[in-house]
Amino acid sequence: MLSSQTSTIFTVSRLNQTVRLLLEQEMGQVWISGEISNFTQPASGHWYFTLKDDTAQVRCAMFRNSNRRVTFRPQHGQQVLVRANITLYEPRGDYQIIIESMQPAGEGLLQQKYELLKAKLQAEGLFDQQYKQPLPSPAHCVGVITSKTGAALHDILHVLKRRDPSLPVIIYPTAVQGDDAPGQIVRAIERANARNECDVLIVGRGGGSLEDLWSFNDERVARAIFASRIPVVSAVGHETDVTIADFVADLRAPTPSAAAEIVSRNQQELLRQIQSAQQRLGMAMDYYLANRNRRFTQLFHRLQQQHPQLRLARQQTMLERLRQRMNFALDNQLKRAASRQQRVLQRLNQQNPQPRIYRAQTRIQQLEYRLAENVRARLSATRERFGNAVTHLEAVSPLSTLARGYSVTTATDGKVLKQTRQVKAGDVLTTRLSDGWVESEVKGVTTAKKTRRKKTD
């Protein structure tokens, strides 16, 4: 008879179902490391095998839709790391795991460490864009932290020599693989910052497996790159290789060669820019000289128009025109007087009264005398005005000033000297005298002291 304390009676099916649900709901997904044994792959494409260690084993299944993502062929005795769900095969009551992903054990553990460190540093803000330093443009000296025997160094130097042979390069050799590599890389970064010889650093190496590149996933290296005052370009492996150093660095280059391309200037492009600048400068200079030459020609013509000899010639021409006009006016007056006289004589001859003739002759003589006197007076006044004009013109003429012993001195630029500050020792001067020019060289300049007038009470 059943005990009254027994509350539930399970069937075998229900028991297995309950256990399966407990395993799946309570345990969820787990990571398991172990050795493969009894590996089989039937026609269905599923994988069945056992994972074991020194003291225990568990049945495993990996269905076709999951195992097609595995990049290697599992082998008997191979250590692997799997992500799986725990379950129970109800018909037989066998406890087993259903695997979702599989990696070789070493690489899988490294990947876990990588993800954990990445999450940690990202949470601390080491990947934030606000901390990224701009690269110098152009760089005046490049530091390279890598193996002195690796292909990466050869690629970097080859690109720098091709693009910018004059760019100085300082190599900080260090191991890039092995247990000692992270410490050496950190010391190389610190040494480059302490010496402060370059303004940009390339930190990297050539391609390899995750284990080969692991030095650049080291937390010490990441923090050294973040603390560097010199901008750092990471150049680790190939374009598909992404390390913690890439996230922390100020800029990530897909390859070492690409890093060299980024930090260097293209010499051919610089040469083209210089040639273009020279061409623009030449065109600007030609335009400037043409403008100055045109301005000089204009000033020269204006100076010629204001030359004393030309002004005197214009005044002489004006006086000649006045003289001609005066002579023409006198001739016209004389002709008109003679014409009037002739008309009067004709009228007298027609009337022929003797007294009137005598009176007319007397009147004519008086008129002739008055006319002659008037003409002589006007001619004398005109001549006097003409003489005064000539005297005035001669008085204001620069040539008259020169004839009185004065001179006019001009500098090499053609400007008339008025003050001593316009010349200096060694300048060549041109002095205009009344009868020619004298060229002289300044031996010295002495400025006369100005005397101040005393104020009177």
From Swiss-Prot:
Please list the GO biological process terms of this entry: DNA catabolic process
Q: Which residues form a coiled coil?
A: none
For this chain, one GO molecular function annotation is: nucleic acid binding
Q: Which UniProt keywords apply?
A: Cytoplasm, Exonuclease, Hydrolase, Nuclease
Q: Which CDD domains match?
A: ExoVII_LU_OBF
What Enzyme Commission number(s) appear in the record? 3.1.11.6
Query: Where in the cell is the protein located?
Result: Cytoplasm
Q: What function does the entry list?
A: Bidirectionally degrades single-stranded DNA into large acid-insoluble oligonucleotides, which are then degraded further into small acid-soluble oligonucleotides.
Q: Please state which protein family the record places this protein in.
A: Belongs to the XseA family.
For this entry, the protein name equals: Exodeoxyribonuclease 7 large subunit
Organism (species): Citrobacter koseri (strain ATCC BAA-895 / CDC 4225-83 / SGSC4696)
